[in-house]
Amino acid sequence: MPSETITPLLAHRARTNIQWFTHKHMRQVSRLNAKQHRVNMMTAENWSIRDELVDQYKTLFAQHLSPRHLSYADGMGGDAELLQAAADFFNRVFAAHSRVQPAHLVVGAGCSSLLENLLYDICEPGEGVLIETPFWGGFETSFVLRSNVTAVHVRPPCHGNGSADLDRLVSAYIEAYERALRQAPCRIKAILVCNPHNPCGHIYPPRVIQALLQFAQRHDLFYISDEIYALSTLDEQTAFTSVLSIDVAALGVDLARVFTLYSISKDLGSSGLRLGFGITQAHPDLRLSLAISNHSRVSTFTSLVITALLHDPEAATAILHQNRAALQRSAKLISDFLAFHQIPFVPPAAGVYVWARLGWRSSSRPGDEPSWDEEARLNDRFEAAGVSVGAGQGYCASEPGWFRITFAIPREELVAGLRRIEQVVGMEGQKWTAI
């Protein structure tokens, strides 16, 4: 008998993944393990209409639950009724130019899971995807852990929401992408466009989308459009344009290279139900591979309730309208707070967060720009004050001091979180009044 227990060794890829993840997400892991209560303004969840959704889901379960919903889902790619309801939803709400058919769709356990599977299918290990900075840090987890894909950074112009000179904006965008492609350390297979943008909250003008589609065609790349915040718009003047609504053939673009991601996590405030949609309208082999990878990954309970909701356009429209109204109120509240304290921020046109330079006064040298170390220390001070926000370095921001602040939380928590931020970065004892 051996005198001591020997722990079996994990595979090299598992050990490599653990090392990468703990280094990349050490702060988030520490926060999850912490016992001190913090106002969570880091996680991009949508609490704006949770009570309304719970009531709606209870009713739908009571009306539609049957013994068959305790079985595996039928069909490849997802439950047939859900695929039909989703196709109708995309055609109606996203104004699809080429009608979305159930055979174009695959359901999975959220957008991240589908993106991970997609990258595994289109990229060889070590190949790259062009992605604009700053970007949500969770994208890298989908890139790295299974597929070993490299995120190749693109630094486009900061255009906010709209531009007075659209021609110049389009030109600057394409120049930034061409430069990143030329300088890439690996072969590039795709571009990933997050529209509306995470974390900046801007919406891409149609002409920028069209130019990026043509860029992808010119360089034989896949065009991946993550549209998870598509219906969480905040600015009535800035309309969202889905890639599904664009006549790509008229641009000389092959529809087979276009892939769209969507989920119920944000617009329907249901991140815990784990349901996302992948749409490929002219690449049946890709659709089949994704269907195989995601077979029976979505709970039939989730399929049941979302199928019933999407089958009722009036109910779905009402929920989405309530969501937008609630998000607009919260966005105004946090924008007023930032403006009161003269903190630079990007006015969000969509999403559940704001991109703000909370660290603009954190430099130890008056008048100088803050450093990355100072950003990290400021983040520690936020944590100590009982509020969690997303520091810009985790989003590959180009300059220190930026933070992503989620505002789609209950109003009492939102005000409490802003008070704690105020304690850390407030100026000369000024106290903002919530209206």
UniProtKB/Swiss-Prot annotation:
GO terms for biological process: amino acid metabolic process; gliotoxin biosynthetic process; mycotoxin biosynthetic process. Induction: Expression is also regulated by rsmA. It comes from Aspergillus fumigatus (strain ATCC MYA-4609 / CBS 101355 / FGSC A1100 / Af293) (Neosartorya fumigata). Probable aminotransferase; part of the gene cluster that mediates the biosynthesis of gliotoxin, a member of the epipolythiodioxopiperazine (ETP) class of toxins characterized by a disulfide bridged cyclic dipeptide. The first step in gliotoxin biosynthesis is the condensation of serine and phenylalanine to form the cyclo-L-phenylalanyl-L-serine diketopiperazine (DKP) by the NRPS gliP. Its EC number is 2.6.1.-. It is an enzyme of class 2 (transferase). Keywords: Aminotransferase, Pyridoxal phosphate, Transferase, Virulence. This is Probable aminotransferase gliI. GO terms for molecular function: carbon-sulfur lyase activity; pyridoxal phosphate binding; transaminase activity. Belongs to the class-I pyridoxal-phosphate-dependent aminotransferase family. Its cofactor is pyridoxal 5'-phosphate. The modification N6-(pyridoxal phosphate)lysine is found at residue 266. Pathway: Mycotoxin biosynthesis. InterPro entries: Aminotransferase_I/II_large (IPR004839), Ethylene_sulfur-biosynth (IPR050478), PyrdxlP-dep_Trfase (IPR015424), PyrdxlP-dep_Trfase_major (IPR015421), PyrdxlP-dep_Trfase_small (IPR015422).
